[in-house]
Design a protein with these regions (language model features):
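A short alpha-helical cap/connector motif
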Residues: 1-131, 138-159, 163-216
Length: 216
């Protein structure tokens, strides 16, 4: 839930995404998130990132923060056979869960999962990416952008979740349970907006997705 978008609108977008694409694996992953209070991008945002990836013909995607593979599911659909999604997460259990879910979905052969710090895993990868997707703990957003901005190909995308942060980016306030997390998101959003090599905008789906296209 976005905590700022109207519930009826969010439910409509989610239902519409479910009409366009349904998979029992997604239902399982969403149920786990609901029971455990685990943050996932949700079906409407999932459809959006798949659309974005397909639009630019993405074949190589780097995820900074992957959880148990929900967002990777959508990217793996987009990159197709022979494409690659590199996942990162600090919890080995999430890697095991991701393998189970994505193997069942028939896309595990397109995924490599690095257990450990997201930026350490990113630094260990060579070359450029078509997409770098960021969903780490929010104090790390600016560092992730700094690491990624030179490694996205021209014509590639930077995608970053939770950039509206329940509306707190507009008021400068914090979520009660996560003090100090708003300012780093605001800084990240400003840095992306000010980079002349990128054309970006915040897509107000769920909790907001920054989408920035590298043009030079």
């Amino acid at each position: 839930m976005s905590r700022w978008m109207d519930d009826a609108v969010e439910a409509y977008l989610t239902d519409l995404a479910g009409t366009e694409h349904s998979d029992p694996v997604l239902v399982e992953m969403e149920a786990r998130a609901e029971v455990n209070g685990f943050p996932i991008i949700g079906r409407a945002t999932g459809r959006y990132v798949e659309l974005a990836a397909r639009t630019i013909g993405a074949r190589r995607v780097m995820e900074l923060g992957s959880g148990y593979g929900y967002s990777a599911y959508w990217f793996a659909r987009a990159v197709g056979p022979g494409g690659e999604v590199v996942c990162t997460d600090g919890d080995p259990q999430n890697a095991e869960l991701a393998e189970g879910y994505l193997r069942t979905a028939g896309v595990w052969d397109r995924v490599r999962y690095r257990v450990g710090d997201a930026l350490t895993g990113f630094a260990a990868e060579d070359g450029e990416f078509d997409i770098v997707y960021c969903d780490v703990d929010k104090p790390g957003y600016s560092d992730c952008w700094r690491a990624a901005r030179d490694r996205i190909r021209v014509g590639g995308l930077w995608l970053c979740d939770n950039v509206i942060w329940s509306g707190h980016v507009a008021t400068g306030t914090d979520r009660d349970r996560l003090p100090g997390w708003t300012a780093p998101i605001v800084e990240h959003n400003r840095m992306v907006a000010e980079d002349d090599r990128y054309v970006g905008s915040i897509v107000p789906i769920r909790d907001g997705v920054m989408a920035a296209l590298r043009v030079t």
